[in-house]
């Protein structure tokens, strides 16, 4: 296809005149989000300056590739906003000559934000390239000169090699990008282009195509925008309308981006090929040398120069130092036209070609001095487009009050120019260069300044009338410059602005007051570099919100809401960060200041009224200019792109935040805010936003500069996940009715202090690591939040804990109140409160409670369990001096072994209904006492309005369970059985000692050792004078031991007599006789009961069951043994089916699965779930019988009472032999196996038991045709080895078991034989099993528990089929027995017979 030059005719060229905008397209791929290309062009989104390894995805979310893998993202600020030119020197741009219509350019951000103060740079000379012998390249090229130095951007360097093939070396030049603003097209997968926008509305950018050709002065690039190229995943092609747009290349050796070419030609309708002219550095050097042909330098230094001139463009410089001389110079020539057509060297590029002879006439001057130079203006000087370059230190001053205007001032690095010359009204001074411009003119300077680089020190001097103004307007742009104040009267703060990328305003120890700070982006920065003097910035807000009539009104000056998107405080560690205070002092309460940049202050932030927001900000994205149709296709909103899931996090730091009025809000996407807060005088401070709720969010529009605050629902998960939790690093002090709320996505790392009716709330999953201290009627609430610190209340303060768990200390002095609502509190130590109210809440008096909780399955150890002394052996007391009210739960840890526990001490005003949940160790008490849990703090009986009940109505300790009783106004743990047992132990021991005392022959001195024992036992008995419970409780647990009752008068008399003897005689050597004497003494001392009491005892014994009296530990031990034995019986059940079956299979497999529930008077019900029995058997048929072997493996999951989990396996090998006499069969069997059982969450060894069994069986078969009736019976003897283990300080001893299993039953079947090779046999089977002779005594600690086994019935129906040599059978059975509930199981058996 013919290549087309992107040339515009006269009308279409007039883009800057606004006549017509005809142009063709920039091509992008529709399969990739258009926003990538837009953000790329404006350095927004992911494509910020310096970004690398940027992932690019297609619209299906698939990774297309990674951009900027070998270079940092380029800074496109050097490209003019219309995209047709790029800045290559301070006032020079480069483009193509056929762009004949544009007359000016501007730089900076897109949008209508008036704070940007966008400046228009006029073309004063087009510098069109003329092809001749000295200039051999294509003449469609020019290097226009601008009337002012550009301050918004630093110029980019040009490549110098004119051989295009040089740049195909991707090792040295690994990255290429281009940018343009031609008419926009999307190319779809079929390579069809759709127009989406006209030309010159906005910029798009991406990487270039691959290099396809090159020559002297040009490069040709080609490719397909639908496919990633060598330079990245975002290829973009230009066409008509993109003429002059730049192409940049990265030099890996120099580590910098360079401008390499400008777009001139290509295939405009396909987006396949682009032709670029290489930039011509040598041509630019010619131009620059022509415009700056006067350089002044005094070899000896201290040069003195005087400039004079007139309006006709003629001037002179007189050198008074060294050898006096005069040099003629050219200045702006007011007699020349302001606008005129420039020279055109190629008629194809004819058109307006506007330039300004008047301004271009002014040349640029260069001054250099190695000491201290001096430049004097003898007349008003207008250099037009000429500027001043200074290298070295100079003083520039007028003879009297002369003025200067020109392109600007460049001060080289490490140089200082003292500037004593005022400017001209409506003229802007451009300050560039890294050096310093020290302004010391006198009076009111009516000219303005734009600072793009280096430093400007403002030290304007007052005139005779006291007038002083350094500049009428001051702007900081590009982020490279600094303006330093030498006093606070240098300018009107309403006339100061931070433009594109801003810069530093150094207060230098002085203070300024702003209504609002005009700012464009986060490049704005206010600092104080003074090392000794503090500075203040005061912001008052707009006084009026009534918009006046007139043009050019900045609407931002009449808004209630204002914003500052820059920084307060220095962030560069190489620069001094002096003390700087920020004061927000609005005139009315309805004003709002949004800080969305950041602060790094050595100083305070103070607020007196209004609303002050600290916030992150939405990530800037390029504006969406697409119409509604195209926007909907892209799935993006029209206009400004703000995605709630894509924000920039901010940080704020100050020494103190003084909120003396109004409301301060730390809003979303603040990653951290550091400093101590003092909130007073009815002020409010809010920290954090709350997911899934409405939150007030303030944002500032980058496009318009307007600030809006609105309520936003944060419900989208993607948005919520994008918001960090704000780290609040500092303390909060509240006083004088102040309020603070820390909520949602916020974490306070510091203490909170409240006085004088202040209020603090921690809520919505927020966190505080620090203490809360309340006094003087203050209130603090923790609601659904995490507080990791202590709470201390004094002077009528109130603390509420709601919907939260708290595990630190609360102390409340007189008059204070603590309220818990749907909350839990774990006390770390002893606690004293005044008033306590519970509303459906729980207080855990000891952190060890959670470690020993038996609400849920506990972690058990089969070995000795060692509990940390610091937790288990430390008991806490909660004392409530005032009133306890409400309803809730108190959780205690206890040790009945030592009669120690957490305690609750209450006043007699206490009332309410409460549950006591007590966790005890497995060790049992060994002395006769009672454990008191709740007692009166003042020895007054507790109120009858106070009620306590035990959780689950019991406490497990060792082998037994304990109840709660109220005795003498206190609440104690009580077990009648254990107390009876311990009481009887005391009686027996005391009687034995007294008997032995009577036989003592040793000296009286030896009796001293025995008396303390007797006294202690006597004291224990005296402490429990109450009538002891009936003997049946003890009988049920002590294996029918001899009945024991309370001491009668007869035993007391006998004891008294023994005591008198014991006082004289004592022989410890006779202690060995105690056990022999105990039984006899029990019989001697046991009182005779009346017939009525005896009958009542017997009836009570009949009604009581062991399972109701034993602890969880005991029940689990009995249930575990029961489950193990029942698994063994299940294996034998399957063998019973084999013995009555006439199958002749040589090998078979059997699978059976069931679910069973067991219950008895000895243990509580448990579930044997998911029992899976698998068997493999072989047998050999003999002449009159058969022999065989069966391998069985069973797995089961058991759930014991209180959800204690157990997993068990059983592996057995059995052998059998059967002999047949006619219809009579007789068989024997023998088996051996091993079981393994383990409690859930165990970390120690399993419980292993070995087992052996043998047995005999017999059956007789009656055949009535095809009907068979077979009665049978059998008996098996089992031997199971003993096993001892320990769990939670409970010692379990299981003796060896030896018991018989009896079974008898009958089987009825009927045989069908359809063919010779097929038989089908349905059957019905009834089996009775009895193992009730097995009654084991399991010992838990010292208590002997009964372990009976029962009997059960089995009813089964099944079907057996034989096809050729294969046999298959299936059955369903139901079982029920004395310990076995109604259960059913199924089985399948598959066999083969050779």
Swiss-Prot record:
Catalytic residues (positions): 243
Keyword Heme applies: no
Annotated Pfam families: Beta-sol_PIC_HAP1_IgA0_2nd (PF24078), Peptidase_S6 (PF02395), Pertactin (PF03212)
Domain Autotransporter: 1140-1394
Peptidase S6 domain segment(s): 26-286
Domain of life: Bacteria
Keyword presence, Coiled coil: no
Top-level enzyme category: hydrolase
Gene Ontology MF terms in the entry: identical protein binding; serine-type endopeptidase activity
Recorded domain comment: The signal peptide, cleaved at the inner membrane, guides the autotransporter protein to the periplasmic space. Then, insertion of the C-terminal translocator domain in the outer membrane forms a hydrophilic pore for the translocation of the passenger domain to the bacterial cell surface, with subsequent cleavage.
Protein name: Adhesion and penetration protein autotransporter
Organism annotation: Haemophilus influenzae
Upper classification of the organism: Bacteria, Pseudomonadati, Pseudomonadota, Gammaproteobacteria, Pasteurellales
């Amino acid at each position: 296809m013919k290549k087309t030059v992107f040339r515009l005719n006269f009308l279409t060229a007039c883009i800057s005149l606004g006549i017509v905008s005809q142009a063709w397209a920039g091509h992008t791929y529709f399969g990739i989000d258009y926003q990538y290309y837009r953000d790329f062009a404006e350095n927004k989104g992911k494509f910020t300056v310096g970004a690398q390894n940027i992932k690019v995805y297609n619209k299906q979310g698939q990774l297309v590739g990674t951009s900027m893998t070998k270079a940092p993202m380029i800074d496109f600020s050097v490209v003019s906003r219309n995209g047709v030119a790029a800045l290559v020197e301070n006032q020079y741009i480069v483009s193509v000559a056929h762009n004949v219509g544009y007359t000016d350019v501007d730089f900076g951000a897109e949008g209508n934000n008036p704070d940007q103060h966008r400046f228009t740079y006029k073309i004063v000379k087009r510098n069109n390239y003329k092809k001749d012998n000295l200039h051999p390249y294509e003449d469609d090229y020019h290097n226009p000169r601008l009337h002012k130095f550009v301050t918004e951007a630093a110029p980019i360097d040009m490549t110098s090699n004119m051989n295009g093939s040089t740049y195909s070396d991707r090792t040295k030049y690994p990255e290429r990008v281009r940018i343009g603003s031609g008419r926009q097209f999307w190319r779809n997968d079929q390579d069809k282009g759709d127009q989406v926008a006209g030309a010159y509305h906005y910029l798009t950018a991406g990487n270039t195509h691959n290099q396809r050709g090159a020559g002297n002065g040009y490069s040709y690039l080609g490719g397909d925008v639908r496919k990633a190229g060598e330079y990245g995943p975002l290829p973009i092609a230009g066409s008509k309308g993109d003429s002059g747009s730049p192409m940049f290349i990265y030099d890996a050796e120099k580590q910098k981006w360079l401008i390499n070419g400008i777009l001139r030609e290509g295939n405009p309708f396909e987006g396949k090929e682009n032709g670029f002219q290489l930039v011509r550095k040598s041509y630019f050097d010619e131009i620059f040398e022509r415009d700056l042909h006067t350089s002044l330098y005094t070899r000896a230094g201290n040069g003195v120069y005087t400039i004079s001139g007139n309006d006709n463009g003629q001037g002179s410089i007189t050198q008074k130092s060294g050898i006096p001389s005069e040099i003629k110079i050219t200045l702006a020539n007011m007699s020349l036209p302001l606008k005129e057509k420039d020279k055109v060297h190629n008629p194809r590029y004819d058109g307006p070609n506007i330039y300004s002879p008047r301004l271009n006439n002014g040349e640029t001057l260069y001054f250099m001095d190695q000491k201290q130079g001096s430049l004097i203006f003898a007349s008003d000087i207008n250099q037009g487009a000429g500027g001043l370059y200074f290298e070295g230190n100079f003083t520039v001053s007028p003879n009297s009050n002369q003025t200067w205007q020109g392109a600007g001032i460049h001060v080289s690095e490490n140089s200082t120019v003292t500037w004593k010359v005022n400017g001209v009204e409506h003229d802007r001074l451009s300050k560039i260069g890294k050096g310093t411009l020290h302004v010391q003119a006198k009076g009111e300077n009516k000219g303005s300044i734009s600072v793009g680089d280096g430093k400007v020190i403002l030290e304007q001097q007052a005139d005779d009338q006291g007038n002083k103004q350094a500049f009428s307007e001051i702007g900081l742009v590009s982020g490279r410059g600094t303006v330093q104040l030498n006093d606070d009267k240098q300018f009107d703060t309403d006339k100061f602005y931070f433009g594109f990328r801003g810069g530093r305003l150094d207060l230098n120890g002085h203070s300024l007051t702003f209504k609002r700070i005009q700012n464009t982006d986060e490049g704005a920065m206010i600092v104080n570099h003074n090392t000794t003097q503090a500075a203040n910035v005061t912001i008052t807000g707009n006084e009026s919100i009534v918009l006046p009539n007139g043009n050019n009104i900045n609407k931002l000056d009449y808004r209630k809401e204002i914003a500052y998107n820059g920084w307060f405080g220095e962030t560069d560690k190489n620069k001094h960060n002096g003390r700087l205070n920020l004061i927000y002092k609005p005139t009315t309460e309805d004003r709002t200041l949004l800080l969305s940049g950041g602060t790094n202050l050595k100083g305070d932030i103070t607020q007196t009224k209004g609303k002050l927001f600290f916030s992150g900000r939405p990530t800037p994205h390029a504006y969406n200019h697409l119409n509604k149709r195209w926007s909907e296709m892209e799935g993006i909103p029209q206009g400004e792109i703000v995605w709630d899931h894509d924000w920039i996090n901010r940080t704020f730091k100050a020494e103190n935040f003084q909120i003396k009025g109004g409301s301060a809000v730390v809003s979303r996407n603040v990653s951290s805010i550091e400093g101590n807060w003092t909130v007073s005088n009815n002020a409010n401070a809010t920290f954090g936003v709350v997911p899934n709720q409405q939150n007030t969010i303030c944002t500032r529009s980058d496009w318009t500069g307007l600030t809006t605050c609105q309520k936003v629902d944060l419900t989208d998960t993607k948005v919520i996940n994008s918001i960090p939790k704000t780290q609040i690093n500092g303390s909060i002090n509240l006083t004088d009715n102040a309020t603070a709320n820390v909520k949602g996505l916020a974490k306070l790392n510091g203490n909170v202090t409240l006085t004088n009716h202040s209020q603090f709330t921690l809520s919505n999953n927020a966190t505080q690591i620090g203490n809360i201290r309340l006094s003087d009627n203050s209130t603090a609430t923790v609601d659904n939040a995490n507080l990791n610190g202590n709470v201390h209340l004094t002077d009528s303060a109130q603390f509420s804990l709601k919907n939260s768990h708290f595990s630190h200390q609360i102390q409340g002095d007189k008059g204070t109140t603590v309220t818990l609502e749907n909350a839990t509190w774990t006390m770390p130590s002893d606690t004293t409160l005044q008033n306590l109210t519970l509303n459906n809440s729980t207080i855990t008096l000891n952190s060890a409670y959670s470690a020993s909780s038996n609400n849920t399955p506990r972690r058990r150890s089969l070995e000795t369990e060692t509990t940390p002394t610091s937790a288990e052996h430390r008991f806490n007391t909660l004392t409530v001096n005032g009133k306890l009210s409400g309803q809730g739960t108190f959780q205690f840890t206890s040790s009945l072994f030592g009669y120690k526990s957490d305690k609750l001490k209450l006043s007699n005003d206490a009332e309410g209904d409460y549950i006591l949940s007590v966790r005890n160790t497995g060790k049992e008490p060994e002395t006769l006492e009672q454990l008191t849990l709740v007692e009166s703090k003042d020895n007054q009986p507790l109120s009858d309005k106070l009620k306590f009940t035990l959780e689950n109505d019991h406490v497990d300790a060792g082998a037994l369970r304990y109840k709660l009783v109220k005795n003498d106004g206190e609440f104690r743990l009580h077990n009648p059985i254990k107390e009876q047992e311990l009481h009887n132990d005391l009686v027996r021991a005391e009687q034995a000692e007294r008997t032995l005392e009577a036989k003592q022959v040793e000296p009286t001195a030896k009796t001293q050792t025995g008396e303390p024992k007797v006294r202690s036992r006597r004291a224990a008995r005296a402490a429990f004078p109450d009538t002891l419970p009936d003997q049946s409780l003890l009988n049920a647990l002590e294996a029918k031991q001899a009945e024991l009752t309370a001491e009668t008068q007869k035993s007391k008399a006998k004891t008294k007599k023994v005591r008198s003897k014991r006082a004289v005689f004592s022989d410890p050597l006779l202690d060995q006789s105690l056990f022999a004497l105990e039984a006899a003494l029990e019989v001697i001392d046991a009182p005779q009961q009346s017939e009525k009491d005896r009958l009542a005892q017997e009836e009570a014994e009949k009604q009581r069951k062991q399972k109701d009296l034993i602890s969880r530990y005991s029940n689990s031990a009995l249930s575990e043994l029961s489950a193990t034995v029942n698994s063994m019986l299940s294996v034998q059940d399957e063998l019973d089916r084999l013995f009555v079956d006439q199958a002749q299979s040589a090998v078979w497999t059997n699978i059976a699965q069931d679910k069973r529930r067991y219950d008895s008077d000895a243990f509580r019900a448990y579930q044997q779930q998911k029992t899976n029995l698998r068997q493999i058997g072989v047998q050999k048929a003999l002449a009159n019988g058969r022999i065989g072997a069966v391998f069985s493996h069973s797995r089961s999951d058991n759930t014991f009472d209180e959800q204690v989990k157990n997993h068990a396996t059983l592996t057995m090998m059995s052998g059998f032999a059967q002999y047949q006499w006619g219809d009579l069969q007789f068989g024997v069997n023998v088996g051996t196996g091993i079981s393994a059982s383990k409690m859930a969450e165990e970390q120690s060894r399993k419980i292993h038991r070995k087992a052996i069994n043998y047995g005999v069986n017999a059956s007789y078969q009656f055949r009535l045709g095809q009907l068979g009736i077979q009665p049978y019976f059998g008996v098996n003897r089992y031997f199971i080895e003993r096993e001892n283990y320990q769990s939670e300080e409970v010692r379990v001893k299981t003796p060896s078991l030896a018991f018989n299993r009896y079974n008898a039953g009958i089987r009825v079947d009927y045989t069908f034989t359809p063919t010779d090779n097929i038989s089908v046999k349905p059957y019905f089977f009834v089996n009775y099993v009895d193992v009730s002779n097995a009654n084991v005594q399991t010992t838990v600690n010292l208590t002997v528990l009964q372990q009976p086994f029962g009997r059960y019935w089995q009813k089964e129906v099944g079907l057996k089929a034989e096809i050729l040599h294969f046999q298959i059978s299936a059955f369903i059975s139901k079982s029920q027995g004395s310990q076995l509930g109604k259960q059913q199981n199924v089985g399948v058996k598959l066999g083969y017979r050779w």
